[in-house]
Amino acid sequence: MPPTSNFGQDITNTTPNDSNNNNRDESNGNSISIVNIERMGGTQLLPRLAGKGVIRVVGRCEDAKENNNLDLSECQLMHVPDAVYHLMRNTELKSCDLSSNVITKITPKFAMKFSLITDLNLSHNQMSKLPDELADLASLLRLDMSHNSFLTLPAVVFKMPKLRQLLANNNAIIDIEADQKQISSDSLELVDLRNNPLTPQCYESLKSAPVNFHIELTERQKEDWEDLTI
């Protein structure tokens, strides 16, 4: 197998590969051969993705080279493969959609490689943490981290200099990593925290927080024990 550094050259197949038409991605007109991907080291760089999964990821990377919007939603990804960074190395991405996968974490490398994106969709995954390096996404305007497994709202979201919209609804968030003094932003317009089991203290703190952006909360129902006096 050739070294992985060769991966990212022309891996599209413009001529038929015998009669094996099942190895092509017909969804967007690309005819990407598994055989060619293997020759370029694709299976080494894209672990846990087999057959059509590799074709789908590579095909969407090729599309992103044209429109600067990387859509890797519903690709059964557990993480962002190194091959994706390699394929996108000469492309200035505007947005990245990683929704509806099984991703458990984003590595610090992501912020370095995709530093110019303005929209990041991480929704419908299995994430519980964000790396502090995401604060380096200096152009990010919108972050969707809804429908994940976050137990706390990461403090890094308040360090993104241009972030306007933060969607963190439908998680398991009970508290915020930052204290009240750190819940501030010159750019934020909306923080959606609906459908999270916030603690009573956190809920009241957010509801009365002296911030210049709107915080959406699901009206909290008091537990029976909260009305008890000792």
Show where each model-derived region lies:
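A generic tandem-repeat structural signature
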Residues: 106-173
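The feature captures the LRR N-terminal capping module
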Residues: 1-123, 129-132, 176-230
